A protein has these predicted regions:
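Flexible, active-site-adjacent loop/turn segments at secondary-structure boundaries
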Residues: 37, 48, 75-76, 113-116
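A broadly tuned preference for mixed-charge, low-complexity surface segments
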Residues: 50-65, 116-126
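C-terminal interaction surface of TIR/SEFIR-family domains
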Residues: 1-7, 14, 18, 103-139
Length: 139
C-alpha cells in the first residue's frame, strides 16, 4: 500500500507528544511530517504568516489527518486547517488520540468531533456526515 503525504493537524500545546507517537508509527511517508521545531518557529509569527505556512504545507500534501485530543475542536488553527483542506479538496480524516499517553503517562478525556462544526454545500450539511473520526486502538 502506498504511503500518503499527510499534514497532521493537532493542538500543539496539549497533544504534541501524542502526535509524535502517531508520526513515528511509520504509516505515512517520512517526508510528509514536519518537526516540532517547525511549529515552534512559525507559531510566533503573525496570523497572516501562519496561514501562509499552513497553506504551503497543505499544498504539498494529499490529505489532512486531524489528531483529536480533548479540546482540539475549539482550536483556531485546527479549524483553519480543516477549512483549507476542504477548500483544496484534500482527503480528510480524524483520529481520536485521547487514549494515547502523554510524556507523563496520562490520558485525557475524549474530545468532540471537530468536523461537526463545519456546514458544507447548499443544504448546509455537517462535514462530520462525510468525514470519519476514528478511535485510536492504541493506548
Amino acid at each position: 500500500m502506498a504511503k500518503r503525504q499527510v499534514f497532521f493537524s493537532f493542538e500543539y500545546n496539549k497533544d504534541s507528544w501524542r502526535a509524535s507517537q502517531v508520526r513515528n508509527m511509520g504509516k505515512v511517508d517520512s517526508n510528509s511530517t514536519f518537526s516540532d521545531n517547525d511549529w515552534e518557529e512559525v507559531k510566533e509569527k503573525s496570523d497572516a504568516k501562519i496561514k501562509e505556512w499552513i497553506n504551503d504545507q497543505l499544498a504539498k500534501r494529499s490529505c489532512l489527518v486531524v489528531l483529536v485530543g480533548s479540546t482540539t475542536s475549539s482550536r483556531k488553527w485546527v479549524n483553519y486547517e480543516i477549512e483549507k483542506a476542504y477548500e483544496l479538496n484534500k482527503g480528510i480524516v480524524g483520529i481520536h488520540v485521547h487514549k494515547l499517553k502523554n510524556q507523563n503517562g496520562d490520558q485525557v478525556s475524549k474530545g468532540s468531533n471537530p468536523f461537526y462544526n463545519f456546514l458544507i454545500g447548499k443544504n448546509k450539511e455537517r462535514l462530520s456526515k462525510y468525514v470519519t473520526c476514528f478511535d485510536s486502538s492504541y493506548s
